[in-house]
Amino acid sequence: MSAAPAYSEDKGGSAGPGEPEYGHDPASGGIFSSDYKRHDDLKEMLDTNKDSLKLEAMKRIVAMIARGKNASDLFPAVVKNVACKNIEVKKLVYVYLVRYAEEQQDLALLSISTFQRGLKDPNQLIRASALRVLSSIRVPIIVPIMMLAIKEAASDMSPYVRKTAAHAIPKLYSLDSDQKDQLIEVIEKLLADKTTLVAGSVVMAFEEVCPERIDLIHKNYRKLCNLLIDVEEWGQVVIISMLTRYARTQFLSPTQNESLLEENPEKAFYGSEEDEAKGPGSEEAATAALPARKPYVMDPDHRLLLRNTKPLLQSRSAAVVMAVAQLYFHLAPKAEVGVIAKALVRLLRSHSEVQYVVLQNVATMSIKRRGMFEPYLKSFYIRSTDPTQIKILKLEVLTNLANETNIPTVLREFQTYIRSMDKDFVAATIQAIGRCATNIGRVRDTCLNGLVQLLSNRDELVVAESVVVIKKLLQMQPAQHGEIIKHLAKLTDNIQVPMARASILWLIGEYCEHVPKIAPDVLRKMAKSFTAEEDIVKLQVINLAAKLYLTNSKQTKLLTQYVLSLAKYDQNYDIRDRARFTRQLIVPSEQGGALSRHAKKLFLAPKPAPILESSFKDRDHFQLGSLSHLLNAKATGYQELPDWPEEAPDPSVRNVEVPEWTKCSNREKRKEKEKPFYSDSEGESGPTESADSEPESESESESKSSSGSGSGESSSESDNEEEDEEKGGGSESEQSEEEDEKKKKTKKKKASEGHREGSSSEEGSDSSSSSESEVTSESEEEQVEPASWRKKTPPGSKSAPVAKEISLLDLEDFTPPSVQPVSPPMVVSTSLAADLEGLTLTDSSLVPSLLSPVSSIGRQELLHRVAGEGLSVDYAFSRQPFSGDPHMVSLHIYFSNNSETPIKGLHVGTPKLPAGISIQEFPEIESLAPGESTTTVMGINFCDSTQAANFQLCTQTRQFYVSIQPPVGELMAPVFMSENEFKKEQGKLTGMNEITEKLTLPDTCRSDHMVVQKVTATANLGRVPCGTSDEYRFAGRTLTSGSLVLLTLDARAAGAAQLTVNSEKMVIGTMLVKDVIQALTQ
């Protein structure tokens, strides 16, 4: 009767609540049901042609694995479905295969060709899963296939697949370490990846494969520091741990001058003149030492690491907080380490497991940096609900923090703890009292008296621990405490704990001259019970007998011989050896041994008092937060924390500005695709097109002319433009010839195609200058390098007339629509007089007023032609108001059909959007012929957040999942306001609504037009007039909520600058500061 439920359960049915999963198996499963019938229904469902049944079967199988049941016998039935076309089934199949591929290697190898096909699947999850399964098959014969797959995945478009490639690297390395050199090449490539999803995984692979290759980190150091705050929490832990060891090898110790600056640690960065004057006794020595030590100045990269990790102290992950804490402890100057104390104390409110690890580290830190935790002394008070291990660790911390100021409070706490029912905890408390008495002389007598009172305690363990501690304290002042020794001697009849009895006997023997009458009587009692004592007590009885024989042989000679005779035949060989050794020393032989003459010096020599130290004293040589530190033993795979270097290594190895500029310009070649988009689809926005496609001086003049509203303004701006252009052209005129040649080649290459596309959207392009036609008529598929144009400005004598001509054309063609980007609700000032008041402060304030600049993001890929089966889709932020809804961000979507068949019914499917985000779809595109391209406009309301908008691009036959994530600078629109209005609004947005950061502007970014161009390229803000030449102000409003965003850049001498952002949206303000600083300092 019981066979049925057992059989049905084996088929995959889950047990009900409270029902044992294996309850029926012992009764009948092994008798009535055969193994070949297990999971038969699941095998049948997997063999059907219906995807729904296969999906249900796979869900049940994965649920079985999650519950810990063995599903390996289903491997043949599951592996057949790896080629299933249903994406959901395929995902679950790969989940199963990852679990069992290593166990069923032969069967997994049969499907290896299917896994290889999965590596080319359009779905990124399938590609990643296929690589994960492939790396789980631990067979050396497929190592070349795995290596090839990892290399391809490292270049995959999806960061998720690249992350999986990083995970596969250590697996392959453990399978075949000979592949190390090739794997290092892949690691080097992935370290250069700028995606936060990949960073943590590749650093983990670096740590396991080649942690000694520190040269791979040099050029990626700053990038890792800047990405750190956005990496997932486990990646943050790995990166911080690696950067801690890296910093210990590349920077000087920030505490190197503290020995000379102990009186004033805050001056450690600048010099030691004051401390030299403070110590008159050691003035000569200090003077001699000073020339050898230069004043410590922290390396900027060292400061970058400390600054970027500090916010992570507020992380919700205890592991991240612990990682940052150990980094600060090992790397930060003494004056800055204190910031970690509050974060660590916060973790003490977490689970007991977290508390245990945190307290282990706090106990180590509190030995060297006691003052750091003193303000939080009460946080380490012990609760009755704490587990014993937590209590003992808190006790350790309290003992480390005890000093002459707070010792009364600490001792009162200890007095309370002694009454606890937890005996281990009470014993640890008595030891802590002994340590306090040792370390703080003025409370020694108080502690000793308290411990003596504990000798009358009913609990034998309390008495025993007190005896052990008293013995150590008496060694410091034995002559003054004869009465205590007599009191302890009386306890030998009652105390049965071996360590306590041994301690009493040692004390009586060591100070037998203070108790000459009691000591022989104690020996007599011990001789009676010698055979029943523990080994540790027997050894001390022998010692006591030897010492009394040497000092009072008349009374104790026979007793000593009796004890030694008993010990001679003891079962323990240590006791027997000690008895023979002692007899030869104290009892002179017939020959009169030389040792017996010196027996008193050997046995009765004064012994130094023991030093009661914390068990955590020497743990700081292990890296805090590591398993080795927790165990106080070197664990497998532990990497030693390097010592600080004597001389700082060359910091230039981390300088990547020059190669990064090159990469940037190469990357910006792709942006040239968007030039026809700005000139064709958005012919109205002349300033937008010009600002991105022309050289700096030309874009500046165009934006100035287009933002003006009259001929008088444009003429005055042209004068200013000529002056600016002469400055920019004069500094880089030597590069102009090379750039002219590049432009001529580009013109020849694109003349025919550019004419076709340009004429379709701009009628006025026939009369434009040669440089403008070159830019505005370029093909979408062709690429030019606008970044290099900005750097290589033509000579001022030639560029000024060209710029004027373009500005006039822009005024003629595009002036009327240029007012559109700012709608009436977004204008702060409605008073024309107020506007004019700000506009007439100075002529220079209007020069670089880019009101609708081109986004620095450029044209981005939305769907690759391989993943889209011939359909490629790009998008770009147009920075123009969306006609359907002013709260939406306007995007231009580019479709290209690269296949040989027409694509029909292009439209947006059902979007899966986070709360608040909405999409205005573009009209359906009925048909897109082979080789044809088209552009459309859609709007997305991102709800003032940088969350990605996920939706489907659908055709008649396929659906493609795509995602658009906006940079924070594209979530706002520019605002016109006067200087007075700006100051008034800024005054309302202070305190938490104000974010300020300091930065250093590079030499290439100190001119007015460069600063303005970089800021407006990063964020869609309007320039606000300003009366001072070294201050820049920009204003905008967020599109959804209309919240003001005010940006101020105060440039000072030598490139120093201060960036301030005021906004109600604190998150947007913080992200904007980060993006603008990155743009200005690149």
From Swiss-Prot:
> Which cell locations does it reside in?
Cytoplasmic vesicle, Clathrin-coated vesicle membrane; Golgi apparatus
Q: Which Gene3D superfamilies match?
A: Leucine-rich Repeat Variant
The membrane topology term of the UniProt record is: Peripheral membrane protein
Q: Does the keyword section mention Glycoprotein?
A: no
- Compositional bias segments (type: Low complexity): 704-715
Q: What ranges does the record list as Basic and acidic residues composition bias?
A: 666-677
Q: What is its main location?
A: membrane
Q: Give the sites modified to Phosphoserine.
A: S272, S282
Q: Which family does it belong to?
A: Belongs to the adaptor complexes large subunit family.
Q: What is this protein called?
A: AP-3 complex subunit beta-2
Q: Which organism is it from?
A: Mus musculus
Q: What is the lineage of its organism?
A: Eukaryota, Metazoa, Chordata, Craniata, Vertebrata
